[in-house]
Amino acid sequence: MLTKFETKSNRVKGLSFHPKRPWILASLHSGVIQLWDYRMGTLIDRFDEHEGPVRGVHFHNSQPLFVSGGDDYKIKVWNYKNHRCLFTLLGHLDYIRTVQFHHEYPWIVSASDDQTIRIWNWQSRTCVSVLTGHNHYVMCASFHPKEDLVVSASLDQTVRVWDIGALRKKTVSPADDIMRLTQMNSDLFGGVDAIVKYVLEGHDRGVNWAAFHPTLPLIVSGADDRQVKLWRMNETKAWEVDTLRGHMNNVSSVMFHAKQDIIVSNSEDKSIRVWDATKRTGLQTFRREHDRFWILAVHPEMNLLAAGHDSGMIVFKLERERPAFALSGDSLFYAKDRFLRYYEYSTQRDSQVIPIRRPGTPSLNQSPRTLSYSPTENAVLICSDLDGGSYELYIIPKDSVGRSDVVQDAKRGTGGSAVFIARNRFAVLEKSTSQVLVKNLKNEVVKKSPLPIPTDAIFYAGTGNLLCRSEDKVVIFDLQQRLVLGELQTPFVRYVVWSSDMESVALLSKHTIIIASKKLVLQCTLHETIRVKSGAWDDNGVFIYTTLNHIKYCLPNGDSGIIRTLDVPIYITKVSGNTIFCLDRDGKNKAITINATEYIFKLSLLRKRYDHVMSMIKNSQLCGQAMIAYLQQKGFPEVALHFVEDERIRFNLALESGNISVAVASATQINEKDHWYRLGVEALRQGNSGIVEFAYQQTKNFERLSFLYLITGNLDKLSKLMKIAEVKNNVMGQFHNALYLGDVKERVKILENAGHLPLAYITASVHGLNDIAERLATELGDNVPSLPEGKTPSLLMPPTPIMCGGDWPLLRVMKGIFEGGLESADRGGTVDEEDVEGDWGEELDINVDGMENRDIEDILAAAEAGEEENDEEGGWGLEDLVLPPELDTPKASANARSSVFVTPPQGMPVSQSWSQKSSLAAEQAAAGSFDTAMRLLHRQLGIKNFTPLKSMFLDLFNGSHSYLRAFSSCPVVPLAIERGWSESSSPNVRSPPALVYDFSQLDEKLKSGYKATTTGKFTEALRLFLSILHTIPLVVVETRREVDEVKELIVIVKEYVLGLQMELKRREMKDDPVRQQELAAYFTHCNLQTPHLRLALLSAMGVCYKAKNLATASNFARRLLETSPVDSQAKMARQVVQAAERNMTDETKLNYDFRNPFVVCGSTYVPIYRGQKDVSCPYCTARFVPNQEGNICTVCDLAVIGADASGLLCSPSQVR
């Protein structure tokens, strides 16, 4: 059994597959109907209008409807698109067992405990026929898939087949009056719309289920006598064919498989049994430990079954549908049915080669799993799971292609896997001894070789090499030298796909794709939410793969995207250009044409083939917000500008790429204050004073404008601004501008007009304006302020700018490949100076006669004018020199030695050497490459919030450098401090940088944290544990054992941080006793040291006991007693248990179930029970509810929840 989907719920009593979509309906004993997407594993909807258990449910074949019947005697018809019940059919007088739509007519058949079967017309919403005859509960009833028959099973120990041909004729409009009269009579006097055709007797006890065969005249039934019976019928009679025995309890449901000649039954003996319908023998049995099975459903089109049991349901397949295939150049060998087939890609010719299995061999779950081909010897190895793993070796005759009558005896053997490793050698895995047998084509053992790891499968990895798979890693093993060539930690690998040049390999797990080099050096990891099915490399080195419902691509750097969606899963065999060749589940070859433009464009960007990028921009229809976001994310905003029409997005991209001209054009179109402000900030950063001035004018930001005029020495406009402030009656602005201008008289005048006569007098006196000072003194009279004597006053004048006007000089760089396209696409980016002046003057009542440096039009035109100088020397600014003719230039002799001193070239700084050689974040930070360190931590651990690490980065950098002071006129000499330095060290070999953090420090902090926890200093303990979590990414250890210890420390500290956060939260919530109890309860489920767990249990027991939740307190008390507490604690716990046994109740209901295993969400502090979806922090592994995905982890305060990360890298031994 291959379980595809499983749910946990109340007992499932009814199941129905949707005929087209990957949906299944499950009706529960609790009265809820669940609609699941079994492919994605998600609950789509739930319907809960029934009162009591719902035992029957069924999808309509073509309409968006389903029907349900329950113990409330009601049949409800639902529209799942509108999420509501359309109507209810009433008529049954007891529990309804099953309901089913007719495949063609608007009928529903229902079986009930009122001993009747009813047929309803769901369009007219009436009962059209009542089938009576059973004298006990009718357990099931169903329509025949093609004929006018109904089969029913009852506890009266019979199976009945009913003929409803008359009902069909009655439903079809009568052709003449005689027929109409007959129908009227039957309506008046009780007609015979349905008659019993056969009564099948043979079961000794009540029959629970009966079902028709989809195509043959067969019926299968299951009963409380633990037997499954097979019946055959013809036009006149029906008889028992055989009885299938094996179930140990009541058979609850039995079905024919839709595609295979088998019968599937389930029973209250907790088993599902699979029977051969032809031989009537048991093939397989699947058991559950605690759950009885109640219902089966078979998908009408696909190889899927579903079974409902006491605690949920499972969707499963009986055998794999992936065809075994092997690629060889332009051809494909694959196994289908009983033949090995050959497919040629160039001609798309498909032919049979040889039979590979004798007819009549049981084929269930024994189809070929893998296929390996040797082109030189024309030999094929086919592996299957038969007998615990076996292989068959066939030598294909050269003239057998196209013929299928060449029968040969295959050479067989047992082994977990078998693959060709050389021209005439193949390797077979012996799982029991974990060794490989190398055999020749005569199936003789040539060599035995033990494997370096416990291996459960082997794959081809080049001539003489094997890729060995264990549960958590893969290794490449050289059989000749018996050496491990590469090793990589991976999830459980299912398939291995090598590129055509054998330089790259894709390792496919259930939900992960790992791209690595031929030596298993990790290149990128990709995670998928739904199952990965297959993959192949295209000609450009892009990995194309399929999931259950998509064809996707993966670039060499790990970027991925969707190429197209799929209706059914496919298995890619080859990618050639824009064509994907694949096999479907029926073993048919298909060629699918795809649009590869998107990933080729991204690949060209990645490989910096900008000529291709430019060509694709001009010729392709690349568009969409996703492409713009990708280009922006990858640092190509200037490319993204080509795809954007929206002015706001263009403005943002232009600012990001520093393209001021496009930004001005977009800001003019948008004309909003915020955009002008941001434009001013960017223009100021670039030193473009003209644009800065223009932006400040548009936002009427006079303070910034006056300061700009001050620092650029534009005193004329500064004086105009002062007049504007005077007109606007802005005293402070007027005074500021006067101060900037150094205009003392104006300042005295402003102070006098503002009524500050003492200040005006002091200003005039200090600056030597005696006439004005005397006049003001007269006005002040006796209130003249006294000035200090003996001080020599100096005039406060603003400094004169050294460089007045002009933009900052910018380095001239080569014109970017993408700039030409932008300039040619003129978007009206120039701003008319007359318009600017008009707005400026109208608003400020003053005429500004142009900008000093250059107007906007000149600015935008200058760049184009400068770039049009395309003569060879124009860009260099070289001039022709007129030299006097009498000065001959002397020629230097060949052996003349120059007396000019040549400075030796500067060597590489040590920090740069460290940065280039290391891939550890701590060493990058010590070298001063903070940006690289942050990128590494983001890629390895998903860290995004680097604020807690800032001080540590600086400590690492300072700790690895020392500075020697020389003469006062000389700069200090920096010295690099290396790790493990000694006097015998070679001066030319650089060791890694010395690090201020090591693992022993963390051990000391951990002990301090334990001590603080024990003494109840939770805030201090939390600080210490968080400090450990923040330090671990920047610690370097030497051995693999120490790496494991570091990873173990992360888990330990994470548990304490989460627990302490909950405890501190609990202490804050004094007004919410229920939440206090919940948080105390969750704290006890953190993985703590025994003394701390004991204290947490004691605390939770006390809180719950005080709240009179005695049952919950009793649970904590029992757990406390299991930890061997001290006498006083044990005595208290026993007293709580005794008190609870007298009254085992809880006064308040808590969101806490100690019987159901759970983890606690690190953000919301609610339990996530086993089976519920969650997301985790890639660094500290704390678990969260799904809606927290994308937020910063609240436990470690570093990583992004749910982010993809390759894992902690803290040792050079992990890199080797």
Swiss-Prot record:
RNA-binding recorded as keyword: no
WD repeat spans: 7-48, 49-88, 91-132, 133-172, 202-241, 246-285, 288-326, 363-404
Subcellular location: Cytoplasm; Golgi apparatus membrane; Cytoplasmic vesicle, COPI-coated vesicle membrane
Topology with respect to the bilayer: Peripheral membrane protein
Keywords recorded for this protein, A-Z: Cytoplasm, Cytoplasmic vesicle, ER-Golgi transport, Golgi apparatus, Membrane, Protein transport, Repeat, Transport, WD repeat
Gene3D superfamilies assigned to the protein according to its UniProt record, in alphabetical order: 1.25.40.470, YVTN repeat-like/Quinoprotein amine dehydrogenase
GO cellular component terms given for this protein: COPI vesicle coat; Golgi membrane; nucleus; plasma membrane
InterPro entries on file: Beta-prop_COPA/B_2nd (IPR006692), Coatomer_alpha_WD-assoc_reg (IPR047312), Coatomer_asu (IPR016391), Coatomer_asu_C (IPR010714), Coatomer_complex_subunit (IPR050844), G-protein_beta_WD-40_rep (IPR020472), Haem_d1_sf (IPR011048), TPR_COPA_B (IPR056176)
Superkingdom of origin: Eukaryota
GO molecular function, one term: structural molecule activity
SUPFAM superfamilies membership: C-terminal (heme d1) domain of cytochrome cd1-nitrite reductase, WD40 repeat-like
Main location per the UniProt record: cytoplasm
Gene Ontology BP, a term: endoplasmic reticulum to Golgi vesicle-mediated transport
Record's keyword annotation contains Cytoplasm: yes
Assembly: Oligomeric complex that consists of at least the alpha, beta, beta', gamma, delta, epsilon and zeta subunits.
Role this protein plays: The coatomer is a cytosolic protein complex that binds to dilysine motifs and reversibly associates with Golgi non-clathrin-coated vesicles, which further mediate biosynthetic protein transport from the ER, via the Golgi up to the trans Golgi network. Coatomer complex is required for budding from Golgi membranes, and is essential for the retrograde Golgi-to-ER transport of dilysine-tagged proteins.
Protein name: Coatomer subunit alpha-1
Originating organism: Arabidopsis thaliana (Mouse-ear cress)
